[in-house]
């Protein structure tokens, strides 16, 4: 979709830990809900290049966790610092969504909860006709030093 909207731009989808670009090539990296590959990000970003790192906010999918677990938990919110980067901004975006039954399994499969939820929790989720849940995204902006 992005390539169609801005055909003059260049896009790549790859492993965070082995990106198919030359050293110092990127002006901007976007890393959504993926591991922080610090060495690779430092390699591919030009000096002064920026990275937007998207992590879950405290209440992200909290109501889903309330279905899955006996004791649901909030995501930890912490200040994050990485060598070689300066934190230059942060914004949190929150909302509430209603996920119909047909899309619940796909959403569940995109989360780390899919791999560690007891069978009973997964069965409770699968039995729902829909799920109304909070979403919360933290956009952390860093600049390469």
State each model region's role:
Residues 1-19:
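Class I SAM-dependent methyltransferase SAM/SAH-binding core
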Residues 48-61:
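Conserved beta-strand signature within the Rossmann-like core of class I S-adenosyl-L-methionine
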Residues 33-47:
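A short, conserved alpha-helix within the catalytic core of class I
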């Amino acid at each position: 979709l992005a390539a169609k909207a801005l055909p003059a731009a260049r896009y790549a989808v790859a492993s965070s830990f082995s990106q198919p670009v030359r050293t110092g090539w990127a002006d901007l990296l976007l890393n959504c809900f993926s591991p922080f590959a610090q060495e690779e990000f430092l390699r591919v970003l030009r000096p002064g290049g920026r990275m937007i790192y998207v992590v879950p906010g405290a209440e992200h999918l909290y109501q889903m966790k309330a279905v899955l677990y006996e004791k649901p938990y909030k995501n930890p919110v912490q200040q994050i610092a990485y060598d070689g980067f300066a934190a230059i901004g942060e914004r949190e975006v929150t909302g509430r969504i209603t996920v119909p039954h047909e899309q619940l399994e796909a959403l569940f499969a995109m989360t780390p909860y899919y791999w560690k939820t007891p069978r009973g929790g997964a069965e409770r989720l699968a039995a729902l006709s829909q799920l109304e849940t909070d979403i919360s995204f933290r956009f952390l902006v860093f600049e390469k030093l």
